[in-house]
């Protein structure tokens, strides 16, 4: 198979030494007793990393305890991290396959090459090109620190339920870039000189809330401050915006060299741009990224994979597995800023994207226009409402390849119904960052026998190949790219 982005061969692009490795760890496809190698646990003498269940007397500093929660694998070498992740993903797939086979009465997979008792072909994990400081987006909370200061900016330890919540500064975490930590530190400086209290619990009052920092590979930095207006007048509210603006333009915060500063007033835990518009206090309204030969526009509210270099590996993998051609319609569900579909647009007859966040759809349309892509269209709204009508409008007999990249909550069951029941979809690529819960249910309903009671009338899909892609070094998380056909 000739790759869309590479020379002919099966997923060959990661066969190189990750940073700091003395020799190549992963080859092409699993051969031999690979599981025995990757299933090796921590080396002798190394303590296993368990997530702290409380914040009572524990060994280690606050910083170490936060690292154990946010980046549980930080004490392992990156090579060992990949072994742990691969073993975990394989166990998930083994359980999933067993359940699907039980539902079908017989094995539902075809005679593809085996990979250590899996019916599907499990490829080796693709390592992240960047191991430390890889996050391009970080959200910092505001609450009481270990010293009791309520104007501490960082990440949480403990739980509200147990009454032991504490906010710990995060500049030591391996996955956070220095720039993000710098902006968080200066936001803390600003809070501690502000006469207004932070909003720790909504009903107890307070104003200043979390900080989000977004950066691109060129070093441009967007900061977004969330603020609870409480009972402030419009004039008082305007004064606070001017004060924080002055701090980051001409005050101590100027050291952050922000490209843009946004302000969002919010009386809810999480507000979209539609619910409460982001207000640009100064700078550029967007940041831009270069990925897969595309210039991509990113709005404050738009989803973009948090590891840019890893995202390129992920999207290349998706593109390779789709097998699209000039007669294919590519259906990109939960498309975000449209990168997957747009990167494949030159190889397909048409790209159809669906995304809930309006800002992300506007970014996708801008990216298409800027890059001269004319065979794409993007729709705003819930996929379960848009997809059935969109599929009905397409010509019979035209092949459709679907790519789904849902949030951790998975796909709505009506989306699964639409995919199952539209016979022109023969190939489906499913990207999952957390294959359990709703995502597991999605896979089962894609592969189970026809079930009129659930309105699953079309032929079942068959899981053919799985490629793990590590976008989250130092954490247990890993993206899985699953190829289904029927």
From Swiss-Prot:
InterPro entries with a match to the protein in the record: SAM-dependent_MTases_sf, TRM2_met, TRM2B_chor, U5_MeTrfase_fam
EC number(s) from the headed UniProt entry: 2.1.1.35, 2.1.1.-
Active site: 433, 479
Binding sites annotated in the UniProt record for S-adenosyl-L-methionine: 305, 355, 405
Cell compartment(s), UniProt: Mitochondrion matrix
Keywords noted in UniProt: Methyltransferase, Mitochondrion, rRNA processing, S-adenosyl-L-methionine, Transferase, Transit peptide, tRNA processing
GO molecular function, one term: rRNA (uridine-C5-)-methyltransferase activity
Name listed for the protein in its UniProt record: tRNA (uracil-5-)-methyltransferase homolog B
Assigned GO CC terms: mitochondrial matrix; mitochondrion
CDD domains xref list: AdoMet_MTases
Recorded superkingdom: Eukaryota
Protein family according to the UniProt entry: Belongs to the class I-like SAM-binding methyltransferase superfamily. RNA M5U methyltransferase family.
GO biological process: tRNA processing
Function: Mitochondrial S-adenosyl-L-methionine-dependent methyltransferase that catalyzes the formation of 5-methyl-uridine in tRNAs and 12S rRNA. Catalyzes the methylation of uridine at position 54 (m5U54) in all tRNAs. Specifically methylates the uridine in position 429 of 12S rRNA (m5U429). Does not affect RNA stability or mitochondrial translation.
Name of one Pfam family that matches: tRNA_U5-meth_tr
Gene3D superfamilies named among the record's database cross-references: 2.40.50.1070, Vaccinia Virus protein VP39
Reaction catalysed by this enzyme: uridine(54) in tRNA + S-adenosyl-L-methionine = 5-methyluridine(54) in tRNA + S-adenosyl-L-homocysteine + H(+); a uridine in 12S rRNA + S-adenosyl-L-methionine = a 5-methyluridine in 12S rRNA + S-adenosyl-L-homocysteine + H(+)
């Amino acid at each position: 198979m000739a790759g869309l982005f590479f020379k002919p061969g099966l997923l060959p692009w990661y066969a190189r030494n990750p940073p700091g490795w003395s020799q190549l760890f992963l080859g092409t496809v699993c051969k031999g007793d690979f599981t025995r190698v990757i299933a090796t646990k921590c080396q002798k003498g190394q303590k296993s990393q368990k997530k702290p269940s409380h914040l009572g007397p524990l060994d280690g500093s606050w910083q170490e305890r936060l690292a154990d929660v946010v980046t549980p694998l930080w004490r392992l070498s990156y090579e060992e991290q990949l072994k742990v992740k691969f073993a975990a993903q394989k166990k998930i797939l083994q359980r999933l396959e067993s359940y699907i086979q039980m539902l079908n009465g017989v094995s539902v997979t075809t005679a593809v090459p085996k990979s250590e008792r899996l019916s599907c072909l499990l490829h080796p994990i693709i390592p992240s090109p960047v191991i430390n400081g890889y996050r391009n987006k970080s959200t910092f909370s505001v609450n009481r620190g270990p010293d009791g200061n309520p104007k501490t900016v960082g990440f949480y330890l403990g739980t509200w339920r147990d009454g032991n919540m504490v906010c710990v500064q995060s500049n030591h975490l391996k996955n956070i870039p220095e720039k993000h930590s710098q902006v968080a530190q200066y936001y803390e400086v600003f809070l501690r000189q502000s006469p207004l209290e932070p909003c720790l619990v909504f009903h107890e009052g307070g104003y200043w809330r979390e900080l989000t920092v977004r950066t691109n590979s060129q070093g441009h930095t967007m900061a977004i401050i969330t603020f609870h207006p409480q009972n402030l007048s419009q004039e008082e509210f305007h004064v606070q915006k001017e004060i924080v603006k002055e701090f980051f333009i001409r005050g101590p915060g100027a050291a952050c060299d922000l490209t843009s500063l946004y302000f969002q007033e919010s009386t809810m835990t999480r507000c979209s741009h539609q619910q409460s518009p982001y207000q640009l206090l100064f700078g550029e309204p967007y940041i831009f990224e270069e990925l897969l030969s595309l210039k991509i526009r990113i709005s404050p509210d738009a989803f973009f994979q948090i590891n840019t270099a890893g995202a390129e590996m992920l999207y290349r993998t998706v593109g390779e597995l789709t097998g699209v051609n000039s007669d294919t319609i590519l259906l990109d569900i939960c498309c975000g800023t449209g990168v997957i579909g747009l990167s494949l647009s030159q190889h397909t007859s048409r790209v159809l994207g669906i995304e809930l966040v309006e800002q992300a759809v506007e970014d996708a349309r801008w990216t298409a226009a800027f890059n001269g892509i004319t065979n794409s269209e993007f729709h705003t709204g819930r996929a379960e409402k848009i997809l059935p009508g969109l599929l009905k409008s397409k010509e019979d007999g035209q092949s459709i390849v679907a790519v789904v990249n849902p949030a951790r909550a998975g796909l709505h069951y009506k989306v699964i119904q639409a995919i199952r029941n539209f016979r022109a979809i023969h190939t489906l690529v499913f990207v999952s960052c957390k294959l359990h819960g709703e995502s597991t249910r999605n896979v089962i309903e894609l592969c189970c026998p026809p079930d009129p009671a659930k309105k699953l009338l079309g032929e079942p899909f068959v899981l053919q190949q799985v490629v793990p892609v590590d976008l989250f070094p130092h954490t247990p998380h890993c993206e899985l790219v699953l190829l289904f056909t029927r």
